[in-house]
């Protein structure tokens, strides 16, 4: 069980409304598209920066709390399920295109960038993804 003290620390790292303990949210983050598997985390946290992720991981490590990174929950292998409970680390707010390097044909993106958004951004530069 995650203590109130840890929840308070999470609230300091990622301010409301991005720390969730309500049953509806936990249920929504308990599954992906894998049939018949449901493992709710004890808390869902939605950071918006690498620093917030680092601080969450430091806190979780200090208290030996498992952390499961969660994306769009469209996977078919159960890889993003919180089978040990703990913290569900939703990456959905990390959705920015950091850089489009036209010379080297590379992009740097955050993990939740939507493919169509990326395709449209590079198309504006005459590129294709």
Where are these regions (language model features)?
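N-terminal glycine-rich flavin-associated loop
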Residues: 10, 35-67, 91-129
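Short acidic, glycine/serine/threonine-rich loops at helix termini
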Residues: 78-83, 119-121
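Short, acidic (Asp/Glu-rich) active-site segment that either coordinates a divalent metal cofactor
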Residues: 77, 88-91
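N-terminal accessory segments
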Residues: 1-33, 62-65
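Short glycine/serine/threonine-rich phosphate/pyrophosphate-binding segments
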Residues: 53, 76-77
């Amino acid at each position: 069980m995650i203590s109130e003290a840890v929840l308070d620390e999470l609230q300091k790292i990622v301010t409301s409304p991005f720390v969730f303990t309500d049953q509806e949210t936990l249920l929504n983050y308990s599954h992906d598209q894998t049939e018949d598997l449901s493992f709710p985390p004890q808390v869902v946290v939605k950071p918006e920066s690498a620093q917030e992720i680092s601080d969450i991981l430091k806190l979780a490590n200090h208290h030996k709390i498992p952390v499961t990174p969660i994306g769009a929950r469209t996977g078919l292998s159960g890889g993003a399920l919180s089978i040990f409970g703990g913290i569900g680390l939703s990456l959905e707010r990390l959705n920015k295109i950091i850089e489009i390097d036209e010379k080297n044909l590379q992009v740097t993106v955050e993990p939740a960038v939507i493919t169509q958004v990326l395709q449209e951004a590079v198309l504006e530069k005459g590129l294709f993804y």
